């Protein structure tokens, strides 16, 4: 079980640090055959121009290849170890299948070294097992949910997230997500029993600007302190408030303005997520 530790103020950079310490995690390096180089583009396109702001720098990482499909049916796997993954907020687990293959998966909460898990159409309802939504009882908590059958998990993959199965009707099941959104998903889509590990992630505090830079996040500059050539809120004599409703650097309204434009799947969303 992870511990939330508030660090002692031995220096200005440590004064506000809150760390998440999990002694069950593997102390060594990652499993080499399931890692690859992670080429960073730092938010630039092929012309070298910034297309995503606030990205760049940070510590070098190796990408862990995660098995989001879990399609080795009816072959039991043993959890060899739990690991930290710098590319995501959740922990990952290295599992060894009975046929000798090893895979990385998103580690659910409560999964321990030595546990046996399996995927298939009719497997036991226990943490870490994968099965179609049609075979999961109502009220169950699930994560790593597919949006299309056998495409791989797309919903509820980050630390502490999950969804609850609240209804079944025809070829669709209804899920309630942590965000408050209620949506329909095909019954043939698969999901993993339980919730994602490391729910304490939201309590973490990096404590200083430099730690944010270690994660590859660059500073966010307010529009009102820019020049008028750089932002609609820029310019003016002295300190100004922008003089208009909040917009992005390209003039799109922000702070509540809806930009979702996917009418094809709107019919599957029964209740939109809560406002932040």
From Swiss-Prot:
Molecular-function GO terms, alphabetical: rRNA binding; structural constituent of ribosome; transferase activity
GO terms of biological process kind: cytoplasmic translation
UniProt cross-references to InterPro entries, sorted A to Z: NA-bd_OB-fold, Rib_uL2_dom2, Ribosomal_uL2, Ribosomal_uL2_bac/org-type, Ribosomal_uL2_C, Ribosomal_uL2_dom3, Ribosomal_uL2_RNA-bd_dom, Translation_prot_SH3-like_sf
Highest taxon of the lineage: Bacteria
Cellular component aspect of the GO annotation: large ribosomal subunit
Keyword annotations of the record: Ribonucleoprotein, Ribosomal protein, RNA-binding, rRNA-binding
HAMAP family the record matches: Ribosomal_uL2_B
Family membership: Belongs to the universal ribosomal protein uL2 family.
Function statement: One of the primary rRNA binding proteins. Required for association of the 30S and 50S subunits to form the 70S ribosome, for tRNA binding and peptide bond formation. It has been suggested to have peptidyltransferase activity; this is somewhat controversial. Makes several contacts with the 16S rRNA in the 70S ribosome.
Complex formation: Part of the 50S ribosomal subunit. Forms a bridge to the 30S subunit in the 70S ribosome.
Protein name: Large ribosomal subunit protein uL2
């Amino acid at each position: 079980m992870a511990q939330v530790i508030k660090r002692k103020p031995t220096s200005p950079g440590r004064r506000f640090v809150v760390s998440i310490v999990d002694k069950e995690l593997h102390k060594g390096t990652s499993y080499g055959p399931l890692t690859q180089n992670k080429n960073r583009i730092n938010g630039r396109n092929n012309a070298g121009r910034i297309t995503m702001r606030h990205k760049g720098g940070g510590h070098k990482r190796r990408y862990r290849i995660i098995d989001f499909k879990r399609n080795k049916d009816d072959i039991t796997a043993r959890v060899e170890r739990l690991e930290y993954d710098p590319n995501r907020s959740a922990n990952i687990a290295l599992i060894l299948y009975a046929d000798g293959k090893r895979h990385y998966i998103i580690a659910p909460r409560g999964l321990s070294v030595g546990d046996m898990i399996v995927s298939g159409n009719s497997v036991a309802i226990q943490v870490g097992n994968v099965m179609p939504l049609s075979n999961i009882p109502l009220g169950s908590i699930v994560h790593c949910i597919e949006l299309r059958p056998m495409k791989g998990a797309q919903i509820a993959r980050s630390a502490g997230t999950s969804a609850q199965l609240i209804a079944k009707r025809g070829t669709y099941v209804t899920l309630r997500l942590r965000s408050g959104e209620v949506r329909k998903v095909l019954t043939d889509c698969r999901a993993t029993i339980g919730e994602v590990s490391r729910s304490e992630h939201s309590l973490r505090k990096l404590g200083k600007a430099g730690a944010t830079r270690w994660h590859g996040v660059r500073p966010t500059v307010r529009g009102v302190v820019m020049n008028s050539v750089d932002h609609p809120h820029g310019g003016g004599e002295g300190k100004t408030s922008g003089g208009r409703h909040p917009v992005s650097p390209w003039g799109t309204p922000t702070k509540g303005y809806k930009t979702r434009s996917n009418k094809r799947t709107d019919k599957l969303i029964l209740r939109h997520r809560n406002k932040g």
